[in-house]
Amino acid sequence: MAFTSLLGSDAERKVAVAEVALRAVLCGLGALAAALVATDTQTRTFFSLQKKATYTDMKAMVLLVAAAAAAAGYSLLQAARCCCCVALLRTSIRPRARLLLAWCVFACDQALAYALLAAVVAALQASVVAKQGLPQLQWMAICALYGAFCRQAGAGVACAVAAAVDAALLAFLSAFNLFRLYGAKATTTT
């Protein structure tokens, strides 16, 4: 059974377009989140002593920048792969090679979604502590002192949340692309 006959060529094209679009959005959101957080800095003067706040002061933000940048780079590479594979699908690709590629994409998409989600959750937790403080440990809310820093970091975290949602949608789509190949195999054997 041909790959295109399982969904039909029009439905397959729509799935491929959706995948490329989701990967492009993830690339943009990941790059934007990484850029917003990585370039975030604010300097304040306290009694003639200058204190500078940067994203490296919070290790969760460093993790977020790394995860968002990795997501942007990975999604750019995968978008290029999608464009190349659409051209290759018109030719004959062995089913075993197609299945191996689908498994690799599925595993990488799952790992990316979980890693990005973990980084976003850690950054959100650190942001809540920065915004509200932690009176039990006598940690003050630093957003009262570094307002511009917190606003830009908040915008970066918001972009990262949207990127994590996009990565989860891509994980679902790659699972669909993988398991529909097993559906085609099951229908040919019966």
Curated annotation (Swiss-Prot):
The keyword Phosphoprotein does not apply. Belongs to the Casparian strip membrane proteins (CASP) family. Residues 1-16, 81-100, 174-190 are cytoplasmic. Homodimer and heterodimers. It is found in: Cell membrane. GO terms for cellular component: plasma membrane. It is a multi-pass membrane protein. The lineage of its organism: Eukaryota, Viridiplantae, Streptophyta, Embryophyta, Tracheophyta. This is CASP-like protein 2U1. Keywords: Cell membrane, Membrane, Transmembrane, Transmembrane helix. Its main location: membrane. InterPro entries: CASP/CASPL, CASP_dom. It comes from the Eukaryota. The chain crosses the membrane at residues 17-37, 60-80, 101-121, 153-173. Residues 38-59, 122-152 are extracellular. It holds the Pfam family CASP_dom.
